[in-house]
């Protein structure tokens, strides 16, 4: 018996290998991924001070907009393997594989090996989960931490040991220091499950939960309270905050604003709804003009996960409200190579072409079924809903007490429903946040399939018909999703999905009395057929290149063909770097500029400090004019690059620079011919082609023709 427990599940191994392939293959072609965060890792490698605070720049002037845990893990990876795009992606890619394994371990003890295999395979094939795992955004690691916490919680229930419960909430606290309040979205499920599943008196349950919540609070607030209690003069400014406070960042910008979409003031934070709509539809918006218009892409001209100057994971508008990223494509006309259309038409970025803020659809109860979001996460959501009914019915016992199967079903439902509800009404989120829904959907599909097959075999009436009903409903919904892509991928896929789904359902309806293996294999074949299109969607970042700043999946990536929304490789102006290094006279900062998008590629390329006076958006009140003048007087800042894209929230500093600085002749530092730059990537939405041909757009790292370099003198 002991030997049997240790047997290797070959099917699981194959699923893990498939997950590893989807998450890892070709990540080595993405040199700097999301430059905003890669710049931070570059800086964090240089000192423990930067490592602790997640400093964006090497001088420790300002932090990124998230807690440090993910970037500390990425920094350790970069220290081990060297600073490469793939080395900062690798932790997230492995976390994605780890999440697939955890799904198996969570489902198998109660629902069996088949359910566990299906759940892990669904998790591996979830399109947005794969897309996020192939970037340096934090969400893949967050989901891994939450699933690890869930495994510890389940162990606490089975073992009846308080230590496992405390460990579970400890890990959720680590999740808070990964992406703040997003980690708390699963707390309702944790609390409810422990109350209904723990074998203890209600008094003991409450005492245990209070203890666990105390651990959660201690771990969650450890880093924020330490940072907030350190004098501001001895630490970096907290990026994307208005009051230089981690707690304000957590509960304001990374908290309530995610739900309301309201601006916190000062031009920073979530754009308002009208600004978002303008960003999504405008043909004239530009990226931060910090790139020579003639610079081209990296040496190989390839990127597996291209980037864009859209908010790295937060939705801020670069350069002080100059709109969002360019509309993409050649010359910025709609989606790459064309008109973009409505969300899900098969061309253009979903953020550009979809309705609602950041192309996430119209808030409402059916938002997850709208074309803007459904192809990223919801393919099997109808099957999961039927699975809930099947699990609650099949798990029922003669006694009125909930069975173990029903209790765990309640847990996954309590994870799914509140988070689905949040995304149904929230104003301020991106497509890749939907990875939070991947675990409960995978669990309910895997366990639900087994329950539905059991009901089909052993029940009569409507309970028996839940299985064919689930197949028909899910088939119909997949055809609804595919209808917008038939012109691009061919109608054959829709026909194939429809035929297999309908024939499977008919076979189950007509031949119910056949022997049991028949129903098992027919229903399994139907489910696998329903997984074909999600798996294709999940593979599109490998096939066509992705978007490292705002990950998404789908055939529309093919139309970008490496030159659309987020597909271009970032470049820096080599002539500018050479000029600054020759003339900087030992200043602490290579140069100062308005925003992090402009600064990031230069930090990555030179490993030197570049001051972004307004943080990511250009509007953080990170430094006053008096403080800036003091730095100039001390010789720490000698050059200022005005991007020509507006002054952000630091008008007084830019005005002072323009009035007192000496303009450097453009021929001394601006390139006039193509210069390929290795080991850099774009965080911009405009392509290098558009940059080169039009002379008007530039990704972060160079400048457009309106950029100006000023020399500042200490005696000013």
UniProtKB/Swiss-Prot annotation:
Enzyme superclass (EC): transferase
Keyword check for Cell inner membrane: no
Top-level lineage group: Bacteria
Regions of compositional bias (Polar residues) in chain numbering: 278-289
Keyword Transferase applies: yes
GO annotation (BP), single: response to iron(III) ion
Transmembrane domains' residue ranges: 8-28, 44-64, 87-107, 118-135, 137-157, 159-179, 180-200, 206-226, 376-396, 409-429, 433-453, 462-482, 491-511, 518-538
Enzyme Commission number(s): 2.4.1.-
Compositional bias of kind Gly residues: 318-347
Entry GO CC: plasma membrane
Residue span of region Disordered: 260-363, 664-716
Main location: membrane
Membrane protein topology class: Multi-pass membrane protein
Keywords: Cell membrane, Glycosyltransferase, Membrane, Transferase, Transmembrane, Transmembrane helix
Intracellular or extracellular location(s): Cell membrane
GO molecular function, one term: pentosyltransferase activity
Compositional bias segments (type: Low complexity): 290-307, 680-694
Alphabetized InterPro entries for the sequence: LipidA_mod_glycosyltrf_83 (IPR050297), RgtA/B/C-like (IPR038731), YkcA/B-like_C (IPR056785)
One Pfam family linked to the record: YkcB_C
PANTHER family with a match to the protein in the record: MANNOSYLTRANSFERASE YKCB-RELATED, UNDECAPRENYL PHOSPHATE-ALPHA-4-AMINO-4-DEOXY-L-ARABINOSE ARABINOSYL TRANSFERASE
Recorded family membership: Belongs to the glycosyltransferase 39 family.
Record-given protein name: Putative mannosyltransferase YkcB
Protein species of origin: Bacillus subtilis (strain 168)
């Amino acid at each position: 018996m002991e030997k049997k427990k240790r047997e290797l599940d070959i099917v699981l191994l194959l699923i893990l290998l498939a997950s590893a392939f989807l998450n890892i293959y070709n990540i080595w072609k993405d040199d700097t991924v999301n430059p905003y965060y890669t710049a931070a890792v570059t800086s964090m490698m240089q000192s423990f001070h930067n490592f602790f605070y997640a400093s964006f720049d090497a001088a420790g002037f300002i932090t990124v907009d998230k807690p440090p845990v993910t970037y500390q893990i990425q920094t350790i990876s970069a220290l081990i393997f060297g600073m490469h795009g793939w080395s900062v992606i690798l932790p997230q890619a492995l976390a994605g594989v780890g999440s697939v394994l955890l799904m198996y371990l969570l489902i198998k003890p109660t629902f069996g090996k088949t359910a566990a295999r299906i759940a892990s395979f669904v998790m591996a094939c979830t399109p947005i989960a794969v897309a996020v795992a192939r970037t340096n955004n934090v969400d893949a690691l967050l989901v891994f931490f939450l699933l690890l916490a869930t495994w510890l919680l389940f162990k606490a229930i089975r073992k009846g040991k308080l230590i496992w419960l405390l460990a579970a909430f400890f890990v959720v606290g680590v999740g808070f220091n990964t992406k703040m309040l997003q980690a708390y979205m699963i707390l309702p499920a944790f609390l409810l499950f422990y109350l209904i599943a723990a074998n203890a008196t209600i008094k003991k349950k409450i005492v245990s939960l209070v203890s666990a919540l105390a651990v959660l609070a201690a771990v969650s607030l450890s880093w924020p309270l330490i940072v907030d209690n350190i004098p501001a003069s001895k630490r970096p400014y907290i990026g994307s905050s208005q009051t230089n406070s981690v707690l304000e960042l957590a509960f304001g910008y990374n908290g309530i604003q995610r739900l309301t979409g309201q601006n916190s003031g000062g031009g920073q934070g979530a754009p308002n709804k009208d600004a978002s709509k303008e960003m999504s539809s405008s043909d004239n918006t530009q990226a931060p003009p910090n790139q020579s218009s003639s610079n081209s892409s990296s040496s190989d001209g390839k990127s597996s996960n291209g980037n864009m100057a859209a908010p790295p994971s937060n939705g801020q508008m670069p350069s002080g409200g100059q709109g969002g990223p360019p509309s993409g494509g050649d010359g910025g006309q709609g989606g790459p190579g064309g008109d973009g259309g409505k969300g899900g038409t098969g061309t253009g970025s979903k953020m550009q072409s979809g309705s609602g803020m950041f192309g996430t659809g119209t808030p409402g109860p059916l938002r997850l079924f709208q074309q803007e979001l459904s192809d990223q996460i919801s393919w099997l959501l109808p099957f999961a809903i039927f699975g809930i009914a099947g699990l609650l019915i099949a798990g029922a016992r003669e006694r009125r007490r909930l069975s173990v199967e029903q209790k765990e079903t309640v847990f996954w439902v309590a994870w799914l429903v509140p988070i689905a509800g949040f995304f149904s009404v929230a104003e301020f989120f991106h497509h890749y946040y939907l990875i939070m829904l991947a675990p409960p959907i995978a669990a309910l599909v895997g366990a639900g399939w087994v329950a539905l097959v059991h009901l089909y075999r052993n029940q009569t009436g409507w309970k028996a018909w839940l299985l064919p009903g689930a197949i028909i409903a899910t088939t119909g919904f997949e055809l609804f999703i595919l209808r917008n892509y038939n012109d691009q991928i061919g109608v054959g896929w829709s026909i194939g999905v429809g035929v297999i789904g309908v024939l499977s359902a008919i076979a189950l309806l007509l031949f119910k009395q056949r022997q049991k293996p028949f129903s098992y294999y027919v229903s399994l074949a139907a489910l696998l057929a329903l997984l074909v299109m999600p798996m294709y969607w999940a593979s599109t970042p490998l096939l066509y290149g992705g978007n490292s700043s705002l990950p998404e999946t789908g055939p529309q990536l093919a139309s970008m063909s490496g030159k659309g929304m987020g597909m271009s490789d970032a470049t820096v102006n080599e002539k500018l770097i050479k000029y600054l290094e020759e003339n900087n006279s030992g200043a602490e900062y290579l140069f100062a500029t308005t925003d992090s998008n402009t600064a990031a590629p230069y930090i990555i390329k030179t490993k030197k400090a570049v001051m972004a006076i307004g943080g990511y958006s250009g509007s953080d009140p990170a430094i006053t004019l008096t403080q800036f003048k003091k730095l100039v007087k001390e010789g720490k800042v000698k050059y200022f690059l005005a991007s020509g894209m507006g002054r952000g929230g630091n008008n007084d500093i830019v005005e002072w620079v323009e009035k007192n600085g000496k303009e450097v002749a453009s021929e001394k530092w601006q390139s006039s011919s193509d210069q390929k730059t290795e080991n850099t990537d774009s965080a911009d939405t405009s392509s290098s082609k558009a940059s080169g041909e039009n002379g008007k757009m530039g990704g972060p790292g160079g400048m457009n023709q309106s950029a100006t370099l000023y020399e500042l003198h200490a005696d000013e």
